[in-house]
Amino acid sequence: MFKALAGIVLALVATLAHAERIRDLTSVQGVRENSLIGYGLVVGLDGTGDQTTQTPFTTQTLNNMLSQLGITVPTGTNMQLKNVAAVMVTASYPPFARQGQTIDVVVSSMGNAKSLRGGTLLMTPLKGVDSQVYALAQGNILVGGAGASAGGSSVQVNQLNGGRITNGAIIERELPTQFGAGNTINLQLNDEDFTMAQQITDAINRARGYGSATALDARTVQVRVPSGNSSQVRFLADIQNMEVNVTPQDAKVVINSRTGSVVMNREVTLDSCAVAQGNLSVTVNRQLNVNQPNTPFGGGQTVVTPQTQIDLRQSGGSLQSVRSSANLNSVVRALNALGATPMDLMSILQSMQSAGCLRAKLEII
């Protein structure tokens, strides 16, 4: 009897948990990307560059670049340029990058250029937080947007003032690394979880011997590794491919107050409750009335007077019952039955949590 009951419990736990690799749950502390930034010029634009009279830094940058190339611009010259734009260039320096390796860069206009399509980024040094140059960027910009204008009307799809250069920067300086120098490596969990940290520790200790791993906190697992780069690479390769049984995650509902989107995971459940939601709408109409004098030579003036009309309407919401829901599909059907908009749904979920009917953490971003 006891064995049968234990078998049922183990089968139930197996259905609730699923296995994931340690590499999908953690990252190695210190193995990360670093941000690079630079300021440069984009040339070759088809009349869509900066208006140099309004962006003097573009002209100043161009003069400095020409002087470095041995070209002197007479003092006081007013250059009316339309095919040059000042831009900021950003990139991510990957871990273990070597000299001569290429990385992608993102180019963004910082002036009043209309479009960077068809432009070429001139050689731009990319610096780190220590003001040292780590890469040089140059190349043709690929812009994903499109636009056209004529007769005062314009149409634009996506962003025209930003683009990307694939393999547009060459690494010139390598970052020092401490990998392979010590006898311990810290694995950082993607999300803080005491249970997951202990499960990863137990999995490593079962495979590598007791004491090989220690959970320092809810996010960090310290692993004892052999010395030397090649030995640590092999050791980490074996550890990262180990599988850990992942227990059900915390029930959570994430609400984006700016876009009105609501996202929930499959652990969210509802208790029975009743919801009444009223709709309040405010309409503001503003018109400009032009009053002109009746006599053209009477000395009167034309006056523009605004006329504003505000209309307030409120429709009563009926009391609707929400049944208890034990899975995500039932929760979705129950919320859809209310007929609420995403903006109304945000306030409904907050009220449900306050009333104790929403069994989940509510996070507003």
Swiss-Prot record:
It is found in: Periplasm; Bacterial flagellum basal body. The keyword Signal applies. One of its GO terms (molecular function) is structural molecule activity. It holds the Pfam family FlgI. Its main location: periplasm. Residues 1-19 form the signal peptide. InterPro entries: Flag_FlgI (IPR001782). GO terms for biological process: bacterial-type flagellum-dependent cell motility. GO terms for cellular component: bacterial-type flagellum basal body, distal rod, P ring; outer membrane-bounded periplasmic space. The basal body constitutes a major portion of the flagellar organelle and consists of four rings (L,P,S, and M) mounted on a central rod. This is Flagellar P-ring protein.
